């Protein structure tokens, strides 16, 4: 009761400051909780396996030395090369730099995201703003395909890719995912909120249909575009099954496949694997 009575004695501005401080304290605690795994990963890459098992994060300052904290997971002092991390000679035949795998993953994730964004946004825009025969049947069919697990189509898709001759080619990864039913549904829902009056005014001013889509509609659904790009990029970046099946040349492998190979070779060298 005393605390409750004191709260009424505070000025509105003081109560607002207290509320703001409490809010920031809660957010800070949540941020620390979320960042803890990442901070542990960053600290682990600078430690040997023995030190990693002994200390959860960094060792005490009194024990900091080149033996407890070093760059051996990145740098081999004997050869003076970055072969601890950037070479995978023990997992695959030949020498392919780690940067090549990283570049392959970036290329596939970025290209697939851009292509999927273009076709999905076009499809969602058409389904939201145009009236044509069979429109709602297409929407129902599109929603139905979202309930089918992607791995269920793996065998027929593999057969199709093999007959086309796209095995060991990035086309096998880019073309099947060029349009996303989930993406078209999201953009359709976003485009429904765009007033038709803006589109009519643009048509009166002489804008083409594609210009309306590009210059009127897309800027208004920018939040949806950002969210879709983030989800699509992360999905393509973490893709493992399809690249592992279709890609056979070592220089075309992606980062998740190489990291999976590192699990076997570096199963007890957690520092190198985490790096």
For each of these PLM feature ranges, what is it?
Residues 1-7:
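Membrane-embedded alpha-helical segments of integral membrane proteins
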Residues 10-275:
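A structural signal for multi-pass alpha-helical bundles of membrane permease subunits
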């Amino acid at each position: 009761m005393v605390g409750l009575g004191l709260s009424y004695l505070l000025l509105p501005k003081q109560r607002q400051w207290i509320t703001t401080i409490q809010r920031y304290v809660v957010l800070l605690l949540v941020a620390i909780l979320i960042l803890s795994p990442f901070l542990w990963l960053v600290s682990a890459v600078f430690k040997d396996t023995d030190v990693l098992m002994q200390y959860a994060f960094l060792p005490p300052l009194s024990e900091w030395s080149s033996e407890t904290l070093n760059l051996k997971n990145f740098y081999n002092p004997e050869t003076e090369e970055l072969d601890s991390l950037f070479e995978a000679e023990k997992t695959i035949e030949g020498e392919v730099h780690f940067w090549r795998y990283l570049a392959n993953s970036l290329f596939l994730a970025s290209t697939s995201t851009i292509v999927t964004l273009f076709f999905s946004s076009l499809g969602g825009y058409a389904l939201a703003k145009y009236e044509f025969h069979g429109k709602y049947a297409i929407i129902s069919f599109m929603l139905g395909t979202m309930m089918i697990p992607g791995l269920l189509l793996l065998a027929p898709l593999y057969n199709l890719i093999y007959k086309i001759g796209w095995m060991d080619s990035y086309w096998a990864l880019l073309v099947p995912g060029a349009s996303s039913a989930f993406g078209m549904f999201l953009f359709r829902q976003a485009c429904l909120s765009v007033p038709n009056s803006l589109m009519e005014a643009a048509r009166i001013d002489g804008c083409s249909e594609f210009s309306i889509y590009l210059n009127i509609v897309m800027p208004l659904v920018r939040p949806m575009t950002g969210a879709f790009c983030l989800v699509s990029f992360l999905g393509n970046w973490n893709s493992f099954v399809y690249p592992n099946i279709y890609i056979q040349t070592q220089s075309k492998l992606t980062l998740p496949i190489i990291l999976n190979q590192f699990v076997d070779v570096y199963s007890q060298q957690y520092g190198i694997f985490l790096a």
